[in-house]
């Protein structure tokens, strides 16, 4: 019987693409820098590529958060300090939230029956404020962020460090819900969790990763669990 829910945040509870677009627009305006649609799309590509390298252990967190702007500015011949831009971007990022349709309402209902924990890669200073802004934090017992855990999904060490902080935790009684087949689903399967792939963006399946459930919206999650 499922008693614990481990929830990813970005593109599971919050629409990160919208949040990123909003924060980047405000950052570049604040710093007097031009921002085109092409630059916005390229920033997303670079960020995804760097986080994938990070997930494989090929680069550090700082390589990702500062390197993405350094690479972007080099490609578009912009003169700006990547560190200043990153800090400004993070400040704007944590000031807003774009909840995925039905997520908050589903959390409120699920929290009556399950112990809910957040499990996310990223920075605690942006993850938690965005959940607070969205009005979702009251439904969580705790939120575990790779930045403070000292490991990141899909590493088994990340999950085991989270498990150690959850009272009476049993992996056999837990389900992870997330949008990423590799970090959430493959990672969860490797440590004995039930898995639910939240395929919000309708990504192609990977035949080597077999989630227990696949959904595209929160009403389907509720149908499984309630």
Give the ranges of each region predicted by the language model.
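N-terminal helical cap/lid subdomain that shapes the substrate entry/recognition surface
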Residues: 2-101
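Intrinsically disordered, low-complexity segments enriched in small/polar residues
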Residues: 14, 41, 87, 112-115, ...
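Catalytic-core regions built around general acid/base machinery
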Residues: 102-113
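Asp-based, Mg2+/Mn2+-dependent phosphohydrolase catalytic module
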Residues: 1-5, 18, 34, 108, ...
């Amino acid at each position: 019987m499922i008693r614990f829910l481990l929830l990813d945040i970005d593109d599971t509870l919050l629409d990160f693409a919208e949040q990123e677009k909003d924060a980047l627009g405000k950052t570049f305006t604040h710093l007097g820098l031009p921002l085109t649609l092409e630059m916005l799309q390229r920033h997303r590509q670079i960020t995804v590529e760097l986080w994938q390298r990070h997930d494989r252990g090929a680069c550090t967190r700082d390589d990702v958060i500062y390197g993405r702007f350094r690479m972007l500015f080099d490609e578009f011949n912009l003169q700006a300090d990547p560190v200043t831009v990153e800090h400004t971007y993070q400040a704007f990022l944590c000031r807003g939230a774009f909840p995925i349709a039905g997520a908050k309402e589903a959390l409120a209902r699920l929290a009556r029956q399950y112990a809910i924990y957040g499990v996310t890669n990223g920075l605690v200073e942006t993850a938690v404020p965005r959940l607070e802004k969205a009005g979702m934090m009251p439904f969580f017992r705790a939120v575990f962020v790779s930045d403070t855990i000292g490991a990141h999904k899909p590493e088994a060490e990340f999950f085991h460090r989270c498990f150690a902080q959850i009272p009476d935790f049993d992996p056999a009684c837990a389900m992870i819900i997330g949008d990423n087949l590799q970090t959430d689903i493959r990672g969860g399967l490797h440590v004995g969790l039930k898995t639910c792939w939240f395929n919000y963006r309708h990504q192609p399946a990977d035949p080597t990763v077999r989630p227990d459930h696949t959904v595209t919206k929160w009403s389907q999650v509720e149908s499984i669990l309630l």
